[in-house]
Regions:
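Intrinsically disordered, low-complexity terminal regions
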Residues: 1-202
């Protein structure tokens, strides 16, 4: 389905759903199967959406709850994102926007932000994997107390690293404005790699 200058409400679809709207919002409720939603100059709101999911906005916000464990990808350009997800494989990407998310039992999490901020609560599966990058932005992640992972963090071009999981603090390069921090919590079964250019990791 595609439309220009129109709002769209989709609900109770159990098969594949694809919608592209220009100058309008999408409200998606109780969807299953493969779901792909796109807007330009519009917002997308999700309520009880399961299945493999791709959501993209330009000049619009994304909000809601993805209840399925299938792969999910959310992308905003000049918009904010507020997402709760149970996806095992979750990708969040933003340019000039904020990401606020929670991920439950995630196996693979990819975070990318340019000139934005990422704030998230993460329940990382055993042997899970997180890759996060920011350019001129912030990565602020909170983990469960029983987290078991190897952490590798790097900050370039004047970026900063704050560690509240252990007593270990970042090392600073002898030459150049670079910092790095490596440590392990628990058995280190999972892996967390975060990097920033002229941004902050916390």
């Amino acid at each position: 389905y595609s439309a220009v200058t129109a709002d769209l409400q989709i609900q109770d679809v159990v098969n594949a759903t694809s919608a592209e709207i220009i100058n309008g919002d999408i409200q998606a409720t109780h969807l299953q199967g493969r779901v792909k939603l796109e807007t330009v100059n519009g917002d997308i709101n999700l309520t009880n959406v399961a299945g493999e999911l791709t959501v993209e906005t330009v000049n619009g916000d994304i909000s809601g709850h993805h209840t399925g464990t299938q792969d999910a990808r959310f992308v905003t350009v000049n918009g904010d994102m507020q997402i709760k997800s149970k996806s095992a494989l979750l990708r969040l990407e933003s340019v000039n926007g904020k990401i606020d998310f929670s991920a439950d039992n995630v196996t693979e999490l990819d975070l990318t932000t340019v000139n934005g901020a990422v704030t998230g609560r993460v329940n990382l599966a055993e042997n899970g994997d997180i890759n996060g990058t920011s350019v001129g932005g912030k990565l602020d992640l909170t983990f469960d107390k029983d987290i078991s992972a190897r952490f590798d963090m790097q900050a370039h071009a004047g970026g900063s690293i704050v560690n509240k999981l252990s007593d270990k603090q970042a090392s600073k390069a002898k030459y150049g404005p670079n910092k790095w921090l490596e440590f392990t919590i628990g058995s280190g079964s999972a892996r967390v790699e975060l990097s920033t250019v002229h941004g902050h990791i916390r």
